[in-house]
Amino acid sequence: MEKKCTLYFLVLLPFFMILVTAELEESPEDSIQLGVTRNKIMTAQYECYQKIMQDPIQQAEGVYCNRTWDGWLCWNDVAAGTESMQLCPDYFQDFDPSEKVTKICDQDGNWFRHPASNRTWTNYTQCNVNTHEKVKTALNLFYLTIIGHGLSIASLLISLGIFFYFKSLSCQRITLHKNLFFSFVCNSVVTIIHLTAVANNQALVATNPVSCKVSQFIHLYLMGCNYFWMLCEGIYLHTLIVVAVFAEKQHLMWYYFLGWGFPLIPACIHAIARSLYYNDNCWISSDTHLLYIIHGPICAALLVNLFFLLNIVRVLITKLKVTHQAESNLYMKAVRATLILVPLLGIEFVLIPWRPEGKIAEEVYDYIMHILMHFQGLLVSTIFCFFNGEVQAILRRNWNQYKIQFGNSFSNSEALRSASYTVSTISDGPGYSHDCPSEHLNGKSIHDIENVLLKPENLYN
């Protein structure tokens, strides 16, 4: 009888699913999530009843509870006096899929009944017991991410403004810096758009438009560009110091290809593989090994970069011991910044597999990872621009020049007012001509005084 009812249900279930789908299409946007939840539950129910029909009957001796569907999850045959356990479903936003659901089979081979309702009962209480705290932590991490990328964009744009405004800073390495900074700006902008418009928009994820997958593709591509432009920095220094023996000029075309062109290859391969083997909504899930298509080349770039930089340090230390060249000291300063950045930008990929257990440890881990991942642009601009000795020197020089010019302008305006007052007083006396009242002051014109005061050699005396 039970099998017959199950068979009827399997026959009728596709019609119910069609009705639910039709209702979903006609529902307004605010009810899309409810329709998706219904579809998930009914799909799981359909698969459960298929499993109940197809799996062989329990042949083991002893008492056991029969396989069943409890309304949300499917349960296998369980020996009497045991507790069955599985992960919480992802039907609802306040359910944590990492928590556990339990169902007890009593000594008589019956599923546990709740005393209040006298109905079979599954313990789903742990699924949302920590939801409030986890939502609060998730919001904090979201705001931390937005702040990190916002600060990164601001600092990177200021740095780019400095590099473009002061032509005396122009050189090939600064050109590489500009491209590196621009890739971080693009990545931060796309990340903010992706997080606010896609990842934080359940209705959009449920509809699964092509645009959100394109957004994820661009995001992963630009993330690759960040690390490959860092590799370009390392290759440039290695070629300059080790290979070309302090050569001045290199062809930058290959650097453009490596920094902007090569990351397209893993990004395209990932997109094709994702669409074929793990085509989830908006490609938003990180629970897939296909992400190694993106992370693998990035880790390789970091390792190659680290090798280049360590080799550069070895060569420079050797040169310093032999020749004590001041030029080697300058190159060592340039290498030091890159040598600091490479481990800092790559440590997140070292820490990803080592997620600790425990509520507090996981929370601390999440905060550290978010700081390392989303404040990278701020870190790059600070080390390559704001801590750069040449940049600091030129900013200090221009600031001093501005202060002197401002002070001279103020002094000249005072002198002009004094001269005007003197000439006006003289003009009040009889018989004096004042065709050019401000022509001479102490034998020199105002223009002459300005020229003397604003000569370049007098700016820093």
Curated annotation (Swiss-Prot):
Disease linked to the protein: Lymphatic malformation 8: A form of primary lymphedema, a disease characterized by swelling of body parts due to developmental anomalies and functional defects of the lymphatic system. Adult patients with lymphedema may suffer from recurrent local infections. Impaired lymphatic drainage in the fetus can develop into hydrops fetalis, a severe condition characterized by excessive fluid accumulation in more than two fetal extra-vascular compartments and body cavities, placental enlargement and edema, pericardial or pleural effusion, or ascites.
Gene3D superfamilies: GPCR, family 2, extracellular hormone receptor domain (4.10.1240.10), Rhodopsin 7-helix transmembrane proteins (1.20.1070.10)
Glycosylation sites: N66, N118, N123
Any Pfam family: 7tm_2
Residues of the site described as Required for RAMP2 interaction: T288
Protein name: Calcitonin gene-related peptide type 1 receptor
Alphabetic keyword roster: Cell membrane, Disease variant, Disulfide bond, G-protein coupled receptor, Glycoprotein, Membrane, Phosphoprotein, Receptor, Signal, Transducer, Transmembrane, Transmembrane helix
Family listed: Belongs to the G-protein coupled receptor 2 family.
Keyword check for Amino-acid biosynthesis: no
